[in-house]
Design a protein with these regions (language model features):
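Bacterial Sec-dependent N-terminal signal peptides
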Residues: 4-26
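A compositional/structural signature for long, glycine/proline-rich flexible linkers
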Residues: 19-422
Length: 422
């Protein structure tokens, strides 16, 4: 197994650069937008990604120095991958980054300063005595068997300093510099090469259980390709017909209210994301602060098609219930919407309940569940349930675990309608 280790060492370095560093936007990829309707594998619509990939075997004597400013975002991280396999080999989350001298980490304590950081990525060929001289407390070591390294930046809910949505989190992308591992002199960074990250797509397939009336949620296994190891997901999928609605209710994970509460939080962020199983792209999403939800109380999520003949009545009922204080949230899915390939996205929907930095020790953490593999030659997820109390969210987590039922639209609109419980 390939491992990446973090060590914390500091000293001074007075070497001057030998090369002019290019614009960092030219070093990193163009923004891989979660809401761009291009990425597969059900990305979160409120995330942005950038990758820098290079052939390590062509630069055996080069380490990387990544210098940047902490962005304004709910969550920020660096992830490192073996680009030949898509396997995660390490990374560092926002709150783990030691800031530069004179700066503060705004993901640890509230800070209005322009705070900066430096991260080194060092190959296995770099001597320990030279590593000890690097002037940073953030050292990422990459094993010798990695031939092509992909570094990925993730931002969730990036804004500018005023809190307005911003593609880059209100700061420039980090600068990547090359460092000669023998002299520690600054040299030109390795040339970025094409990465497999943009080629990742999820597998499209049909399931008999999509026609079932009940819709259970399972813990997703760790992603095979370029996963965010600091995120956990519950997933479900079903076929929503034009004359029906899908409803699921649960208590969302409680979240910190301030940066100072990040340490020890049950999670940093949650969202509900809907994607098309026809192409594994995401199209509709809602995140914690936008959702009609209250801490410690059940929130209800309703999905119906835009093509439902009683859509206006469904919308009116949801609004009326919200006015009465109900925590209802409505998704209107357009099954005729065309994807980037000109094909309709269809009416078989995947649902992802995402938690970032979930607390594994919390009683109701989704990470305490047993993962259930997606459909494969051995069957569908529901066929693989051998321990319901650990694999089905509503059994493992009680009211904190979602479970869905489909209803005829006519029944949902009755005055005496009541949501079923399991």
């Amino acid at each position: 197994t390939t491992l990446l280790f973090m060590s914390f060492i500091g000293c001074s370095d007075n070497d001057q650069p030998d090369e002019t560093i290019i614009d960092p936007k030219e070093q990193w990829s163009a923004t891989l937008r979660g809401d761009g309707e291009i990425l597969g594998a059900y990305p979160d619509l409120f995330s942005n990604y950038w990758e820098y990939t290079y052939n390590m075997n062509e630069y055996p004597d080069v380490a990387l120095r990544i210098e940047g400013q902490f962005p304004h975002a709910r969550y920020f991280s660096f992830s490192l991958y073996d680009d030949e396999t898509g396997s995660a080999i390490g990374g560092i989350n926002d709150h783990e980054i030691i800031p530069d001298e004179g700066s503060e980490n705004p993901f640890v304590s509230t800070s209005e300063k322009d705070n900066r950081f430096t991260i080194y990525v060092v190959p296995a060929s770099m001597d320990e005595t030279q590593i000890a001289k690097l002037p940073s407390e953030n050292i990422c070591r990459v094993n010798a068997d990695i031939k092509r390294l992909a570094i990925c930046i993730r931002h969730y809910l990036g804004t500018n300093a005023n809190g307005d949505k911003d593609e880059y989190g209100g700061v420039a992308l980090p600068v990547i510099k090359g460092i000669d591992i023998h002299s520690l002199k600054e040299i030109q960074a390795p040339e970025r090469t094409e990465s497999n990250i943009e080629k990742v797509t999820g597998q499209s397939f049909s399931q008999k259980s999509d026609e079932n009336r009940d819709v259970p949620f399972f813990l997703a296994p760790k992603g095979r390709y370029y996963p965010n190891n600091s995120t956990a997901y519950l997933y479900a999928r079903t076929h929503v017909h034009a004359d029906s609605v899908l409803i699921f209710s649960f208590i969302p994970v409680p979240l910190p209210r301030t940066v100072e509460e990040y340490e020890g939080a049950k999670a940093r962020y949650w969202s509900i994301c809907l994607g098309a199983t026809s192409n594994t792209r995401s199209y509709y999403s809602i995140y914690d602060k936008e959702a009609n939800a209250k801490e410690g109380e059940k929130a209800t999520f309703i999905i119906c098609l835009k093509q439902n003949s009683r859509l206006a009545e469904i919308q009116a009922k949801v609004e009326a219930q919200k006015q009465l204080g109900a925590h209802w949230n409505l998704f209107v899915w357009d099954s005729e919407k065309q994807d980037v390939d000109g094909k309709p996205i269809g009416d078989v929907i995947a649902i992802m309940y995402r938690n970032i930095l979930p607390d594994k020790d919390w009683e109701y953490s989704i990470t305490r569940m047993t993962p259930t593999e997606y459909k494969d030659d051995e069957g569908e997820p529901i066929d693989k349930v051998t321990d319901p109390d650990k694999q089905l969210a509503h059994k493992a987590l009680g009211d904190y675990g979602p479970y869905g039922f489909k209803y005829a639209a006519n029944d949902f609109l009755r005055d005496d309608f009541e949501e079923e419980t399991y």
